[in-house]
Amino acid sequence: MSNVAENNDGVYDAPTGITAPPIDELLKHVSSKYALVIFAAKRARQINSYYQQADEGVFEFVGPLVTPEAQEKPLSIAMREIEAGLLDHEEG
C-alpha cells in the first residue's frame, strides 16, 4: 500500500513494503524467485543465529556483511547482502 502525495493530484509516493532492494536486482544473483526465497531465508537464519550466539559469547555463524540499520530485520540484511554480491549462491 502506498500513500497519496500531499498535493492530492493522484500521484502516489513510492510504495512501502519489500521494495528495497528491488526484486529485479535480487533476481540477477539467482536462477529463480524460488531460489531467492530459499537463499535469503537461509542467510537470514544464519544472521539471526549469529545475534543470538553473540549474547552467549559463541560465534559459530558469520555476522552481517553489510552495516545493519537500526532495527533492521535479518531478512532485510540478507537481501541487501545478496544485492551487493557479497554471498555466493550454489544451487543443488
UniProtKB/Swiss-Prot annotation:
GO CC list: DNA-directed RNA polymerase complex
Family annotation (InterPro entries): DNA-dir_RNA_pol_omega (IPR003716), Pol_omega/Rpo6/RPB6 (IPR006110), RPB6/omega-like_sf (IPR036161)
Top-rank taxon, per record: Bacteria
Protein keywords: DNA-directed RNA polymerase, Nucleotidyltransferase, Transcription, Transferase
GO BP terms in the entry: DNA-templated transcription
Any one GO MF annotation of this record: DNA binding
The protein's enzyme class: transferase
One Pfam match: RNA_pol_Rpb6
E.C. number(s) listed in UniProt: 2.7.7.6
Catalysed transformations (reactions): RNA(n) + a ribonucleoside 5'-triphosphate = RNA(n+1) + diphosphate
Subunit structure: The RNAP catalytic core consists of 2 alpha, 1 beta, 1 beta' and 1 omega subunit. When a sigma factor is associated with the core the holoenzyme is formed, which can initiate transcription.
Described purpose of this protein according to its UniProt entry: Promotes RNA polymerase assembly. Latches the N- and C-terminal regions of the beta' subunit thereby facilitating its interaction with the beta and alpha subunits.
Family membership: Belongs to the RNA polymerase subunit omega family.
Protein name according to UniProt: DNA-directed RNA polymerase subunit omega
Species of provenance: Corynebacterium diphtheriae (strain ATCC 700971 / NCTC 13129 / Biotype gravis)
Name of the gene this protein is made from: rpoZ
